[in-house]
Design a protein with these regions (language model features):
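Conserved N-terminal glycine-rich FAD pyrophosphate-binding loop of Rossmann-like flavoproteins
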Residues: 1-22
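Flavin (primarily FAD) cofactor-binding/catalytic cores of flavoenzymes
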Residues: 1-6, 27-283, 295-381
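Post-kinase regulatory C-tail/linker adjacent to protein kinase catalytic domains
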Residues: 282-290
Length: 381
């Protein structure tokens, strides 16, 4: 997957907390707001174990194709343990595969003759590989931001970020700069639209991902770019053309785990018949309303408000446990402002839990100096 060594949460854990399983419950105490990946993984697995979910899941199965026939979904799939191809019928299908696993790789002039290394952020694993290297990072979203900071933190000689449309515009630390759009490569030299030239040893493409569902028939596939409200999904979940097909987590995201939970609770109630679908006209009107609101958004604060209101609406439609979405909204906005103040130190801040109200302690070591990302080092020092 796209999770690399030394990856720490780039948003406050208090914004992604599960309403029914707090960080305090899992760790037995409040922990700092920006944990590394091992800590978050442990938290997620703790919730899985509490619910005894593994015994209810069929693993080692690859879906080959999904078609809708005679009011049923016909799935062909491979049982990898026994190397058998099987076919079964199902009443509902929930697609919750995520959309950050199939890289989008653009072409640049001179790319094929570049003598250095070119990789997508999906394949980025260890920033220490690039110690004393001149690194070019292409992109202007969260992956570009974090990969660039990681390379700088672990000793890259230089880090140059090339953006296509809008610069991130942060106050980058020494050794980092942001320039406008890669025009071409000439040997080991990267030449940008604004005339900047930079020697390059490695180019990391933080250019996004594709929504990719090869296991679904064409007529069932969601086709969209990464956006806060994909079209054809009623309440961001139910496939407009077939209400027995549901998608979870297909949005661009500020909210994550608790939004996915609200979607899952809503999907459960649709499947169980507790939530009835309105008329086709009402569904179209509701989708159009949300898409129109999304298209007017101009800045992160507005985007946070938009997704918070969406998640609150879903929350109101099921019995998902109580959680303070207004505090989450405030936490997100404060986090964005911390990044503007200092992109290098925003992870050293503290936030309050929307589940327990507890205030996170400040981490014992500033992020920019914390080279050990193990759970033991994070929790026990």
């Amino acid at each position: 997957n796209s999770m690399y060594r030394y990856l720490w949460s780039n948003g406050p854990k208090e914004c992604l907390e599960f309403a029914d399983y707090s960080f305090d419950e899992h760790f037995g105490k409040p922990i700092p707001s920006f944990p590394p990946r091992e800590v978050l993984h442990d938290y997620i697995i703790g919730r899985v174990n509490k619910g005894n979910l593994k015994n209810k899941i069929k693993f080692n199965t690859r879906v080959i194709n999904t078609a809708f026939r005679n009011n049923k979904f016909e799935l062909s799939y491979q049982d990898k343990a026994n190397n058998k191809i099987l076919v079964d019928s199902f009443d509902f299908v929930v697609v919750s595969t995520g959309h950050f696993s199939v890289p989008f790789i653009p072409e640049y002039k001179g790319m094929n003759s570049f003598p250095g290394r070119i990789m997508h952020s999906h394949d980025f694993r260890d920033a220490e590989e690039f110690r004393n290297k001149n690194v070019i990072v292409l992109g202007s979203s969260y992956s570009a931001e974090d990969v660039a900071l990681q390379c700088n933190k672990y000793g890259a000689k230089s880090v140059t970020i090339g953006y296509r449309n809008n610069a991130m515009g942060f106050k980058w630390p020494k050794g980092m700069k942001e320039v406008h759009y890669l025009d071409r490569l000439e040997g080991k030299k990267a030449i940008f639209k604004d005339g900047t030239e930079q020697d390059a040893d490695v180019i990391i493409l933080c250019t996004g991902y594709l929504h990719h569902f090869p296991f679904l028939n064409e007529d069932l596939q969601l086709k969209t770019h990464n956006r806060l409200y994909p079209p054809k999904l009623y309440k961001g979940v139910v496939w407009q053309n077939n209400h027995k097909l549901l998608y979870l987590g297909m949005q661009d995201q500020f909210h994550t785990f608790n939004m996915f939970d609200c979607q899952a609770w809503y999907a459960r109630d649709v499947i169980m018949g507790k939530i009835k679908m309105p008329s086709d006209d009402e569904i179209e009107k509701d989708i159009s309303k949300w898409v129109a609101m999304e298209e007017k958004l101009e800045n992160p604060d507005q985007m946070i408000d938009f997704q918070t209101e969406y998640t609150k609406e879903l929350h109101s439609m099921s019995d998902y446990p109580k959680i303070d979405f207004e505090l989450i909204r405030e936490n997100f906005k404060e986090w964005e402002h911390h990044k503007v103040e200092d992109i290098l130190t925003y992870r050293n801040k503290s936030f309050s839990s929307p589940v327990t109200g507890s205030v996170a302690p400040i981490h014992h070591t500033p992020w920019e100096k914390a080279m050990d990302d193990s759970m033991k080092a994070f929790l026990n020092k």
